[in-house]
Amino acid sequence: MLNEQKCEACSIDAIALSKEEQQSLLLQLSDWQIIERDEIPQLEKVYKFKNFKQAWAFSNKIAELAEDEFHHPSILLEWGKVTITWWSHSIKGLHKNDFICASKCDALAIEE
């Protein structure tokens, strides 16, 4: 399972996942989508909560995950929702690390 894996160091010469690899890994996630911003594929999901405080607490858990994995997403915190966007900045695309971290986000959301 993806959430049991650990991120690997992703250097600038790492190879981004092919569209086929992305789609295969996406099948292992729930409600994530691949979007493009500035021609860079990114993995994104919106989590919904009952209030701002719960959303904030979840955001803090994601921040801790990011530090633990040394891989950092975009986190948009709003009233009752958090949008998480993963991509690998160094390769301007998606790496397996992004899917691993997305899966770990889902595991953290279940704990909420």
UniProtKB/Swiss-Prot annotation:
It comes from the Bacteria. GO terms for biological process: tetrahydrobiopterin biosynthetic process. InterPro entries: PCD_sf, Pterin-4-alpha-carb_dehyd, Pterin_deHydtase. It is an enzyme of class 4 (lyase). SUPFAM superfamilies: PCD-like (SSF55248). It catalyses: (4aS,6R)-4a-hydroxy-L-erythro-5,6,7,8-tetrahydrobiopterin = (6R)-L-erythro-6,7-dihydrobiopterin + H2O. Keywords: Lyase. The keyword Lyase applies. Pfam families: Pterin_4a (PF01329). The keyword Oxidoreductase does not apply. Gene3D superfamilies: Transcriptional coactivator/pterin dehydratase (3.30.1360.20). GO terms for molecular function: 4-alpha-hydroxytetrahydrobiopterin dehydratase activity. Its EC number is 4.2.1.96. NCBIfam families: PRK00823.1-1 (NF002016). Belongs to the pterin-4-alpha-carbinolamine dehydratase family. This is Putative pterin-4-alpha-carbinolamine dehydratase.
